[in-house]
Each structure stands twice: as structure tokens, then as C-alpha cells.
Regions:
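Positively charged, solvent-exposed patches that mediate nucleic-acid binding
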Residues: 1-135
Length: 135
């Protein structure tokens, strides 16, 4: 779309431990998951005041247990770029809502296949996640 800004400001980055830890707690009922190919999304909604920012979506990226910092950072960059270009799928859904969607994107594939499977699987996963929050 012509008028959209495809930015990824710091306020949308999921950095606080108290927001990240509940996403990985298996005993919680309010955490959902979407898995498509090599990408898994963990998500939950929280009150906007709890995040510290007035942003509709906060997202973090975990490349998994990839050996070597260069390859791990490359996978993280691919995940961030894939989300940045398609972020409006989620942001538009949560713009008018009083809560914030917190998402952790996990890469669960082979590092050699990252450059092909992330652009293929991440958009599908984001679409499935957005479909869960249809009005």
C-alpha cells in the first residue's frame, strides 16, 4: 500500500522479561501458538498499561539454537524483515483494541534452509494469527 510506513520502532520490540516469560510458561491457558513450517508464533494479549508503551503489537524474535553468531544474526534479521514488511496484518487488527498483542517468533528449522523457508512460512503464520482475532 502506498501510504503505509514499514517501520519497526523500538516501542514494538518485546524486551521485558515479565512479558516474555509468560509466553514460554506451559501451564498458562492464555498463551496461544501458531506453527507453520519452520516458524512458530507464541502469543498472548495483555493490557496496554502493562507493556509500558502505547503500541498495539510487541514482538520478539528467537532464532533458536543455531551455532555461530553470524548465522544466528542472519536468521534473526530475516525474521525481523519478514515481519516488518507484513506487520500491518496484525497492527490493523489491534489498533482500536484496548489491549496489546505480545508475540514471540521462533525459528525451528535448519539454518541452511532459513533464507527460503522464512519468507515462505512467516507470512502464512502471521495470516493465521490475524485470523484468530477476526472481529
Amino acid at each position: 500500500m502506498a501510504g503505509r510506513a514499514y517501520r519497526f520502532p523500538r516501542a514494538t520490540r518485546l524486551k521485558r522479561r515479565r512479558l516474555i516469560r509468560p509466553l514460554f510458561d506451559r501451564d498458562r491457558d492464555d498463551v496461544g501458538t501458531v506453527a507453520v513450517g519452520c516458524v512458530r508464533l507464541l502469543f498472548r494479549t495483555v493490557a496496554r498499561e502493562e507493556t509500558g508503551y502505547d503500541t498495539p503489537v510487541q514482538i520478539g524474535f528467537a532464532p533458536g539454537r543455531i551455532r555461530g553468531a553470524v548465522v544466528r544474526n542472519r536468521v534473526r534479521r530475516l525474521l525481523r524483515e519478514g515481519y516488518r514488511v507484513r506487520q500491518h496484518v496484525l497492527v490493523d487488527r489491534f489498533q482500536q483494541r484496548p489491549d496489546t498483542l505480545t508475540v514471540m517468533v521462533l525459528f525451528r528449522g535448519r539454518e541452511e534452509a532459513a533464507s527460503t523457508c522464512i519468507p515462505r512460512d512467516l507470512p502464512k503464520a502471521l495470516e493465521r494469527l490475524a485470523a484468530r482475532f477476526m472481529p
